[in-house]
């Protein structure tokens, strides 16, 4: 089970609403929503990881479980069809750090981007590797 966390960007007029925080995954050479393997204490686990990765206090993070999806998809790395199970959470960050207010920023060597759904959909690499999740987020949010 994979946990997908959607961080909506709601902190500055310049960025407007409806932007999501994605990161560049060097293994896949692609931008993905933040995601974690499922843990028995999902919400605490997610908050701890978000706090650690984004350098923000845990008490500034509010999480809401939204939905789940199970689907079959071809795995490029394993060269076979696999069943994927995703849980989607919406994260609200109460107080953004100054670095997170930039359209593109880096923390601990990982590059993050605030992107709208239309920007994600116009990235052919993202669509090729992650269109199932992009479409599901678009339908669900």
List the model feature ranges, each with a label:
Residues 23, 64-68, 115:
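Conserved beta-strand termini and adjacent loop/short-helix elements that scaffold enzyme active sites
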């Amino acid at each position: 089970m994979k946990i997908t966390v959607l961080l909506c960007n709601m902190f500055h007029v310049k960025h407007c609403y409806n932007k999501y925080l994605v990161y560049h995954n060097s293994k896949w050479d692609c931008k993905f929503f933040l995601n974690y393997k499922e843990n028995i204490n999902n919400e605490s686990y997610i908050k701890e990881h978000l706090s650690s990765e984004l350098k923000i206090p845990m008490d500034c993070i509010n999480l809401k479980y939204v939905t789940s999806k199970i689907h079959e998809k071809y795995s490029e790395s394993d060269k076979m069809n696999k069943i994927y199970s995703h849980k989607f959470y919406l994260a609200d960050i109460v107080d953004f750090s100054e670095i997170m207010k930039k359209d593109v920023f880096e923390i601990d060597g990982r590059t993050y981007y605030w992107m709208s759904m239309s920007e994600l959909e116009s990235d052919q690499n993202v669509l090729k590797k992650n269109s199932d999740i992009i479409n599901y987020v678009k339908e669900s949010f």
